[in-house]
Regions:
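Acidic (Asp/Glu)-rich catalytic clusters
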Residues: 23-29, 44-58, 83-90, 106-116, ...
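Short, acidic/polar
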Residues: 14-28, 76-87, 131-141
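Catalytic beta/alpha-barrel core
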Residues: 13-15, 32-43, 64, 85, ...
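Active-site-adjacent beta->alpha loops and helix N-cap segments on the catalytic face
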Residues: 40-56, 99-115, 130-133, 157-171, ...
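C-terminal alpha-helical cap/extension of soluble enzyme domains
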Residues: 169-230
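Structural motif corresponding to the early beta-alpha repeats
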Residues: 60-86
Length: 230
């Protein structure tokens, strides 16, 4: 099983114990599933149960162990996070690692690339819109490598904030970028940014994993409309 190569890839997020059941379903309103391990562990789901669900999956999986500073629900110790990443890595097709933790998680990234997994390097502005300087730093730290995507998610409070995110896609047309908005305008931003070429678009399968996140079914319709107009 491989991570989808066509785009936009619709990712259905799973953050709850009941949501793990989606992994074994034959049909989903998504091309792949993002498993938010931090949220599951915070919800008292044992790591062993997560691993067991991954063993029965019928869809490609993006594995995310998010840190609190970027929207995660569990305060990790570095060694604990690294160990769990490596334990679950054989059962997934892609991983998400924050740009801020690349150095600490480098062994995980190296192993993912060695075993043919996709890597999403992410950055998030959760509480307030990202500044131009912040975005420039994120872009400056990214090296476009095979099977690697830069994901930037920023809070949107105005059309100017959306324009700033859209400019990322317009100014880097050949880059593997996934760009999305957070907050009250999240759904509208996904429509605009997907149309501009965002490689990934997220929607929840069980409950929202980020502020304003629409459902995977809504996102699927949006992505289909974009594909039909290309």
């Amino acid at each position: 099983m491989k991570f989808p190569e066509t785009h936009p890839v619709v990712l259905g997020t799973v953050t709850t114990p009941s949501g793990l059941r989606f992994l074994a379903r034959k049909k989903l309103p998504a091309d792949a599933v993002e498993v938010r391990v931090d949220a599951l562990l915070a919800g008292k789901v044992p790591a062993e149960k997560i691993e067991a669900a991954l063993r029965t999956k019928k869809h490609p999986v993006l594995l995310t162990l998010r840190i609190p500073a970027e929207g995660g629900q569990l305060a990790w110790k570095v060694a604990q996070r690294r160990e769990l990443f490596l334990k679950l890595l054989p059962h997934v097709e892609a991983i998400d690692v924050e740009l801020a933790t690349v150095r600490a998680m480098q062994p995980v990234i190296d192993e993912a690339r060695r075993t043919g997994k996709n890597v999403v390097l992410s950055a998030h502005a959760i509480q307030k819109p990202a500044t131009p300087a912040q975005i420039a730093r994120w872009v400056g730290r990214f090296e476009p490598l095979p099977a690697t995507i830069l994901k930037i998610a920023g809070r949107i409070r105005s059309w100017r904030d959306l324009q700033q995110l859209a400019a990322l896609l317009v100014n880097h047309p050949g880059w593997p970028l996934a760009v999305m908005g957070l907050g009250p305008y999240a759904a509208q931003s996904r429509a605009v940014l997907t149309a501009l070429g965002s490689r990934l678009v997220y929607g929840y399968l069980d409950q929202p994993a980020a502020p304003g996140q629409p459902s995977a079914a809504e996102v699927r319709k949006m992505a289909l409309a974009v594909k039909l107009t290309k």
